[in-house]
Amino acid sequence: MSRSSTSRRGSESRPELLSPAGSLEAFFAAMENGADAVYCGLPEFSARAKAKNVTFDDLDHMLDYAHERGRRIYVTLNTLIKEAELPTLVRTLADLEHLGVDAVIVQDAAVWRLARAHFPGLRLHASTQMTIHNAAGVRTLEKLGFSRAVLARELTLEEIAALRKQTRLELEHFVHGALCFSFSGQCYFSSWLGGQSGNRGRCAQPCRRRYRYQQQQGYYFSPNDLCAIDLLPDLIAAGVGSLKIEGRMKSAEYVAAVVGAYRQVIDAAPAQRKDAVREAKQALKLSFGRLPTRGFLTGPRPTDIAVPSVKGATGRFLGEISAAGRSSISFKTRDALHVGDRLRVQPRSDQAGTAFTVKTLNVGRRSAKQAPGGTLVNVPSPFENRFKKGDAVFKVSSRKAFTLSDAACRRRLKGAAPRPLPISLSVRLQNGQLQLKAQSGEVTLERSFDVSSFAAHKNPLNTETLKEVFARGGDTPLELAELHAADLPPVVIPPRELKEIRRTFYGELGGLIARGREQQRRAHLEQAQAALLPEKQAAAAKDARLTVALGSLRDLHLLNDPTVDRIIVPLVPHRAADIAAGAAKLRNRREQVIWDLPFILFDTTWQQARDAVRALVSAGFHSFRLNNLGHFELFDGVREREALKLTAGYRLFSLNSQAASAWKDLGVGEVTLYPEDDRENLAALLRRDTGVETAITVHGQIPLITSRIHIRGVRSDRPVVSDRDEKYIVQSRGGLTTISSETDFSLIGHLAELRAMGADRFVVDLAHVGAFSPRGKQILAAYAEDRPPAQTSSFNFERELV
């Protein structure tokens, strides 16, 4: 019985323009400049935890304001959830269903599982953090009850159009804003450096920093900003129904400028579109973004998406500090500068910048309100001894900024009419009584009222008269969706009596609906709370089982080692002949082999992967590790389906017991827990009986970034080095780029502790070094002794995953 909007969503004929609303001010900027919908976050579970975000009370009034204007609001719950946070998540879902939000945007399978089972009033959108990049992934979402997929930004227009033909699901795609170097949801860079996880909404953006490769400084991992304003007809033709603007961390001024520009182009008639695009591009130049790129939309190998010589900072570059005083800076400004503009100074060390608003401005020895481009200016700073000569100065907003205080925003929101609840009404007049039956959701009310009626000489009581009377809810926020009136006699009822009946009936109905909605909220909440798994009693430790991940089939004889229970080997779709040859060697060890499916599987290679899976199943292999939602369909129609042993890899995110249970619901028998996790959460998860086996990766090379972006001129034989002397290896293979630390991840040395928590299945990933290399042998020896290998990191295990 939620109060969701009935306004039309995006379609291929008229797309939805979807704007960020990281603050109340940005919400109004979006509304006033033509957004059809906005997405916003709450204080918890938002992938932009550093944004202002909104409260539940704010959201309630925002929904009133938006729905009154036929607009929609989607709420982001697109982070990974810790075990201890599940009770808060359940309460959040109950409140969002009660409020009637138009959809929630989801990453963690726990949110899907709980919403599907206990909060049916919530529409689900799959976040781009789920890395949906092929038709099989979209079709899987459709089967799971999602209504929309936010596609990976790595897809081309051609790939989107081909995908569109294979699904009826709503498709959403980013058209403007910051790009991640990595596939969204698959970056561990920030978390690796300090526990601030991008998948928990706290990315510290180390990709935007400057690095060194063979003494050449550059911004190797910093993409330019997406701008697809001249590709909107192509996106619509490809089947994208929602055009999304990135920027919940951006100012209201940015939102106003970008939404206004895209609205102008979307609404332009075909004959005027060229002029509209030209004007919109000019307006976008003032939005203080990075250099524009079309991203992958025009092809899989864009040359302008990441240029190492271009700074990764946002804002319009004004110049470098030529002189730094104790509390002022001097520089030659490239663009006009005004009192009221906001500046950010970026240190040459490439650490975080410092922002401040220009309060006074000096040109020469005179104070000025503004200075034209090309002028040497002196700007007093509120910070003492903070800046140095050579630091870069950026303008990040102008004096003309869209400004509205939070208090002013809330006053405007409270002026919106409460959202009416739709009702259907049946009316009958019989034996001097007006019989009414109303229904709204699960609530039904029937009442009879004595009325005075007179024979009608003209204009007898009819459906239109009744609609006119009962369409007005008065003080009760109800909306007449439909009215049925059967066999009305030719009489007249005094209008005053009809209005009094409406007032009495609607007053009772409104109270009944309110009580029913609250009872439904409590019932759904209690059901979901009861479904959360309790802690289980501690069980006796089982014998540890070791699985070793290999990089190729040449190390298959590792299975001769009695301490190795299983091996994981890569399934490479285009090398089916090699797979078949390797499979022949393994006929007697089939149950000890797990075939690892490639995480990224574009539609051009998906069928090859399916053929390889079927060939392996026919050869008697049953164990496969899945790493993306698009992998589940690979096993549809496979013979011996019931004999399959499917493992969920860590890229499917199992950070809590509900996510692990979700994979069980989909036929998975074992889940590999999330390597970003910390000690406390791992222990809490392992204390729950999810009904699936759990494995923990205890050693490996973590791919901090997986990307479709090719870095020209950078090879794997030399590291890319940070200003802190941290070294990273860049590898390119199969059209993908991976960036890994030279330092391995390892929990070896903590095995006894993990076993005490209840873990008994461990994965040692030696794909990057080889099982029989000196380093591989050292790691296996360290595992046998539970001794920490040299030069490794425990990632977040001993510190908190934030």
How should these model regions be labeled?
Residues S2-I132, V150-E154, E158-S242, M249-A392, ...:
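Active-site pocket-lining/capping segments in soluble small-molecule metabolic enzymes
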Residues V138:
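Extended, positively charged loop/linker patches that create polyanion-binding surfaces
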